[in-house]
Amino acid sequence: MTTLAIDIGGTKLAAALIGADGQIRDRRELPTPASQTPEALRDALSALVSPLQAHAQRVAIASTGIIRDGSLLALNPHNLGGLLHFPLVKTLGQLTDLPTIAINDAQAAAWAEYQALEGDITDMVFITVSTGVGGGVVSGGKLLTGPGGLAGHIGHTLADPHGPVCGCGRTGCVEAIASGRGIAAAAQGELAGADAKTIFMRAGQGDEQAQQLIHRSAHVLARLIADIKATTDCQCVVVGGSVGLAEGYLALVETYLAQEPAAFHVDLLAAHYRHDAGLLGAALLAQGEKL
């Protein structure tokens, strides 16, 4: 059975056909509409899936935000242009006339990355550092989603009580500092207004402020990982996302994590499936009907 997998992120929408063998075919992307209107997202999703839906027997969605009762509830609306709520399962069911499931994108990615691990690992945490910061937790070989879908939203734990206000309403969240959006928001002077990709490029060229912003992000993430180790005693942490997979970033995180007491150290791995983990994880969960 072929699954039409969809990944809804703060920057881009992706879709692909995924067979029972886990092979990804006909992958395509569109920019995520920066609009508060549900119609804009519906139209973009329609354009994305229309060339693919005839070749699939079901739909699996991995989306940013809390997924509850098949709907997207934005914990940080800024990541979706201000959109607060969107009926994912209902909308894709109407667009495709196919059975549809939905799960948080980081939870989906965690499940895919867990399947790729070698050895006797039963407990792992996946962290995505991208437009926002999200996560997924596998404990005892089972994916934790929580009764309300909130499990794994580790980007909204505290990094700095005097830090910037996060889009979720809290102050000093990890996401507000370590994410691509957080890195860009802290830029000043000639870097003001630059996006995270530009800041990473400037850091590679030796720009001191750009390097400081990236180090700040990596340091915050390392402290988060130490907290996660203390909370879950996980055997490894897998890092993905456009920032998490940026050249040199994970090495910085490892350097800062090494400065923590040894009890809080944990193996760090780069995401095996890179930017396709959410798509694949959603399809795997649909195949296993675990949602």
UniProtKB/Swiss-Prot annotation:
Q: List the disulfide bonds.
A: none
Q: List residues binding ATP.
A: 5-12, 132-139
What molecular functions are annotated in GO for this chain?
A: ATP binding; N-acylmannosamine kinase activity; zinc ion binding
Instruction: Kindly state which reaction or reactions the protein catalyses.
Output: an N-acyl-D-mannosamine + ATP = an N-acyl-D-mannosamine 6-phosphate + ADP + H(+)
InterPro entries found in the cross-reference section:
ATPase_NBD, ManNAc_kinase_bac, ROK, ROK_cs
The domain of life is: Bacteria
Q: In which pathway does it act?
A: Amino-sugar metabolism; N-acetylneuraminate degradation; D-fructose 6-phosphate from N-acetylneuraminate: step 2/5
Biological process GO annotation list?
Answer: N-acetylneuraminate catabolic process
List the SUPFAM superfamilies.
Actin-like ATPase domain (SSF53067)
Q: Cite the PANTHER family for this sequence.
A: N-ACETYLMANNOSAMINE KINASE, ROK (REPRESSOR, ORF, KINASE) FAMILY
Q: Give the protein's biological function.
A: Catalyzes the phosphorylation of N-acetylmannosamine (ManNAc) to ManNAc-6-P.
Annotated family: Belongs to the ROK (NagC/XylR) family. NanK subfamily.
Assembly, per entry: Homodimer.
- What is the protein's given name? N-acetylmannosamine kinase
Q: Give the organism the record lists.
A: Escherichia coli O157:H7
Source gene?
A: nanK
